[in-house]
Amino acid sequence: MDKQRIHFIGIGGIGVSSLARYFLAQNWAVSGSDASKSNETRELVRDGAKVLITHKPSNLNPKTNLVVFSQAIPADNPEIVKAKRLGIPVISYPEALGELTKQYRTIAISGSHGKSTTTAITSLIFRQAGLDPTVIVGTKLKEFGGRNFRLGKGPYLIIEADEYKDSFLNYHPEAILMTNIDREHLDHYKNFAGVKRGFKNFSKNLDKGGVMILNRDDSPVRNLFKSDKRVIWYSLKDKKTSNLISKVIKIPGRHNVSNFSGAFKLARHFGISQKNILKAISSFKGSWRRMEYRGQFKIQNSHAYRQAGKFKAKVYDDYAHHPTEIKATLSALREAYPTSPLLCVFQPHQSKRLKVLFKEFTESFKEADITLILPIYFVAGRDVELGKWNSEALVKAIQKKYPKQKTFYLKDPKNLRNALQILIPTFGDESCAPSSVVKRPINRLGKPVIVVMGAGDVVNITPSLLE
């Protein structure tokens, strides 16, 4: 008997690729296409998928049973056009995932920020408790073999529920964990009222008798659901829980303690013991592109650093692309490295986001001693140049607001290594930045810390910095 065939358009995306792996695990014949090769497409080939680069009608096998497309794919994509002409069912990634949520006891992790890490730790807690969940998440976990998917034999499906284009309205969960609500995806929602309305509508998808685990510390969440009877609240003000987590958590940042508090409350609701929860939290060392330690950058030009025996800077990679996320990551790194100079390399993601949140972006880099801003990453089909709303304007605005802080525009990311070799030796100079850290004598400074941030192709730059 022939295998069932499924074809994914935009298979290299972090969400779509996880669903492709689900169908591979179910022994379907999986094919897909993407605009360019990437680590994700190469890994999918190793996992058993047939991946074709560029979109064209010939990519689609006429015997395909189902076509699933990424939200980033336009309706006139040649593979979609051919599938419809042949009468092959065509659905979006959220619609496909939505069908899966009906087959499991689904736990949906939502929120403007922190979804991936919270989904990851929730999954590991359930695994630690022996509940063997199936997991679809927007990051990669070492515990899942460096993948964004896990097939379990238990009744639970734990998913990351993205709000973009109202994706989460396709899902039918037994439980919702909501970390926060912020001014994000305004290209779709238009304004903050629209964002809040989207989350409110999502709550209506909760199964009868279901529960919502919500962050009381987030005022939009608190105000939106203050009279909802289905809610279990969590908060950093719950010192008993937050202190337990703070004692065992391995990754820095109050936002992570908050998110893990939500996972703690959720797990307790499902009868998981405190012992298993804390064991999972204590063993979690982070996930892909979430303040991920990547290696070290060798400092060539600093005589002072060589004298002090500090030849290398630590390099982190982070997905932050919204002001709230940038501030949270920089604060967490400052908490982890209180005596280290902190250098941030940031690639803005979408000119529309930069325009709408320009003031907030200007105020996001306060914790960094030096900031390098790269050109905007434009998202195909979702973005256009918006004149004065660009990286150069952001640099000027930051320089005006924080005149003592060193902020630069780096037009060509290929020059990043050279820029770092020039800038890192300036640490220890009284004029470097307003931070008290960089005013220490250089022999009392910790090793410099570099964090490379953004949701675009900046991820491909980080390896070039490593030894």
What is the meaning of each model-derived region?
Residues 4-19, 29-35, 287, 323-324, ...:
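Active-site beta-alpha connecting loops in nucleotide-dependent enzymes
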Residues 2-5, 22-28, 45-46, 58-62, ...:
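Phosphate-binding loop of NTP-binding sites
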Residues 3-5, 9, 44, 70, ...:
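Adenine nucleotide phosphate-binding catalytic loops in nucleotide-utilizing enzymes
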Residues 33-49, 145:
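N-terminal beta-loop-helix "entrance" segment that forms/cooperates
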